[in-house]
Amino acid sequence: MRGHSALMMAVVTLAAVSSGAAEVANTAAVSSDYLIGTILTFAESDRLLRVNDVDDVPVYHYPPEKGKRTTFFEDRMKKKLANPEKIRRLYWKWYSMGYSAREVVQHLDQTDNRELKEIYHNLGVGYAEFVAKMNV
């Protein structure tokens, strides 16, 4: 009877060890499958700095196959503000709404974009001159 118990204990121990090793090997195989094909990717911006760009060619941020290509906001602002009639209408709208030159400058000075900051500064200075002319 003692021999039978010892033999049963040995069989149970071997069965537990062999099934545990199979589970560990199986888990390792599955986890290594997940590691294959993982590649780190980085998002790249298509917009480039145009420091030395002297051309007035508009820069498009949509690919040509989209049909309608749109220029950057800064380029559209410069084009619209090149028309004195549109600027005058904008100043009249602000003046009729009761905005002071100080309020306009404060609201326009909320950007970190260097190109827009220059455009907005010129708008604020122009509106201050417009208000000064209207108050005389």
Curated annotation (Swiss-Prot):
Its main location: secreted. Residues 1-22 form the signal peptide. It comes from the Eukaryota. A motif (RxLR) lies at residues 47-50. InterPro entries: RXLR. It is found in: Secreted; Host nucleus; Host cytoplasm. The keyword Nucleotide-binding does not apply. Keywords: Host cytoplasm, Host nucleus, Secreted, Signal, Virulence. One of its GO terms (cellular component) is extracellular region. Belongs to the RxLR effector family. Effector that completely suppresses the host cell death induced by cell death-inducing proteins. Has the canonical translocation RxLR motif, but lacks the canonical EER motif, which characterizes most oomycete effectors identified so far. This is Secreted RxLR effector protein 15. It comes from Plasmopara viticola (Downy mildew of grapevine).
